[in-house]
Amino acid sequence: MKPNMKIFDSMKNLKKMKRISSVLLLLTTAFVLASCVKINDGEVSELSNLKEEIWCGSEGSRIFGQMYLPGNHSGKLPTVILSHSSSLTHAAMAGYADLLALHGYASYCFDFRGGSKESLSEGNVDDMTLFTEIEDLKTVMKTISALDYVDKSRIYLMGSSLGGVVSALVAEEMPASVSGLILFYPAFNISSLVNGFSGFPGMETAFTQSLKDYDIMEHIGNYPGPVLIIQGTKDFIVPPSVAEEASVKYKNAELHLIEGANHGFNKANLGTFGSFVSAEYDDIVMPLVYDWLEK
């Protein structure tokens, strides 16, 4: 019996069509997957941020930091410099920097020299004091303000806890260089906290010694620019009364109390406490920041 050639041809065509369909399916799948892949750091997209490593200062005392930029930016940008809490690093503020960049701000977060054992900046933990951190922030401001894409007339300082204290004190020294202050649970009571632990083993450090006779509240309040203070009502380190007292000292301050929030609005900023304390307040906090910046 002779084979039916039409049947063979039909089968061959069917196989060919299946192969073509398979190739098309693979190409379509690859395209869909590629569109879902996260853009790597350093790539520019209208929907993503550009992250750039920038070092400040001179050899031997260099300060590590990362700049977040809107992916489609052009011209001069308003800029926010973010200072982290005690014993943390730039990583604690990176999420905020990323969000600010999405809203059109150049945002730089950095490691204080000796700020923690995980710090990428040069410097020793044993040498860190409030005043070395003040000098660090001033060094950072000098470097960042000189960048081509930074609008020097719109530089804001944002800090959490000790970083908030440092930002506030730098603004007192350099009011003309600071367009505004954003302070998350600023530890203006840190001197009394340090004095409360005086004499305990391991507490006699350069940092604690430098704060014993230094009342921070006496050194703030003269900065004439706008100040935003955001404070948790359940903060176990900085009571709301501290933020309330500070807000009265400033001539142009806005205070927001976040009900139930502790000393950190997310796990990254709670440090070791983030493992067992619930903290997801960024969705409440950051819209306050955006609105304030746009005023």
Predicted ranges, named:
Residues I39-S74:
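N-terminal cap/lid segment of alpha/beta-hydrolase-fold proteins
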Residues L77, H84-L88, T233:
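Active-site glycine-rich loops that stabilize anionic/oxyanionic intermediates
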Residues S86-D98, F112, S241:
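The serine-hydrolase catalytic nucleophile loop
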Residues A92, D126-D148:
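Alpha/beta-hydrolase active-site loop
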Residues L99-E122:
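Conserved alpha/beta-hydrolase
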Residues Y223, I229-Q231, D235:
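Short beta-strand/loop motif that positions the catalytic acidic residue
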Residues A253-K295:
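C-terminal catalytic histidine-bearing segment of alpha/beta-hydrolase fold enzymes
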